[in-house]
């Protein structure tokens, strides 16, 4: 009989040790059911997401002979003062200006394949080298004028590169040939 008492005591001791190391569940968060909730009964069907009455003033961009090229292409041609303002913004952000030109297609086109690829008009010819260290917007504008003079039937765009992140940050058309 003594052996059975010792045996049950050993089991009880072992059971108490395991229970002492257990962690109680966290009960610090309260249920949201105890908080009062006020809900607005919205039975008005006109409050469903819509564009309201603005449907009549939306227009579709006419795709025939009015292609979009780059950023700001929906605006009229930029004047020299407006170009200087954009170039100053580019320089103020610490981006490196670079000029590119395209003599045949100033827009994305696909002649080699139906799906997008490397040769679909996104890559233009670089005008000289990127203007590293340029701090004067008039220097960039002078290069635009020189590119226009050399290639009067070409599109000229200004690009701003961030040489720290190594990405293109801005790109806009500075000159379009007559008729575009």
From Swiss-Prot:
InterPro entries: RuBisCO_ssu (IPR024681), RuBisCO_ssu_dom (IPR000894), RuBisCO_ssu_N (IPR024680), RuBisCO_ssu_sf (IPR036385). It is found in: Plastid, Chloroplast; Cell junction, Plasmodesma. One of its GO terms (cellular component) is chloroplast. It comes from the Eukaryota. One of its GO terms (biological process) is photorespiration. Its main location: plastid. GO terms for molecular function: ribulose-bisphosphate carboxylase activity. Gene3D superfamilies: Ribulose bisphosphate carboxylase, small subunit. Residues 1-56 form a transit peptide. Keywords: Antiviral defense, Calvin cycle, Carbon dioxide fixation, Cell junction, Chloroplast, Host-virus interaction, Photorespiration, Photosynthesis, Plastid, Transit peptide. Belongs to the RuBisCO small chain family. The basic functional RuBisCO is composed of a large chain homodimer in a 'head-to-tail' conformation. In form I RuBisCO this homodimer is arranged in a barrel-like tetramer with the small subunits forming a tetrameric 'cap' on each end of the 'barrel'. Heterohexadecamer of 8 large and 8 small subunits. RuBisCO catalyzes two reactions: the carboxylation of D-ribulose 1,5-bisphosphate, the primary event in carbon dioxide fixation, as well as the oxidative fragmentation of the pentose substrate. Both reactions occur simultaneously and in competition at the same active site. Although the small subunit is not catalytic it is essential for maximal activity. Involved in antiviral defenses. This is Ribulose bisphosphate carboxylase small subunit, chloroplastic 4. The lineage of its organism: Eukaryota, Viridiplantae, Streptophyta, Embryophyta, Tracheophyta.
């Amino acid at each position: 009989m003594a052996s059975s008492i010792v045996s049950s005591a050993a089991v009880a001791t072992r059971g108490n040790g395991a229970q002492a190391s257990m962690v109680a569940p966290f009960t610090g968060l309260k249920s949201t059911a105890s908080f009062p909730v006020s809900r607005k009964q919205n039975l008005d069907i006109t409050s469903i997401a819509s564009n309201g009455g603005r449907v009549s003033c939306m227009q579709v961009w006419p795709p025939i002979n009015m292609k979009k090229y780059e950023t700001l292409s929906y605006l009229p041609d930029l004047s020299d003062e407006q170009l200087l303002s954009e170039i100053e913004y580019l320089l103020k952000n610490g981006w490196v200006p670079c000029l590119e030109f395209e003599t045949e297609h100033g827009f994305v086109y696909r002649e080699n394949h139906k799906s997008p690829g490397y040769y679909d008009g996104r890559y233009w010819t670089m005008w000289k080298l990127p203007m590293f260290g340029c701090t004067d917007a008039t220097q960039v504008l002078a290069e635009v004028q020189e590119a226009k003079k050399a290639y009067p039937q070409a599109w000229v765009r200004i690009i701003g590169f961030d040489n720290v992140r190594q990405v293109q940050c801005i790109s806009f058309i500075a000159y379009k040939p007559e008729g575009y």
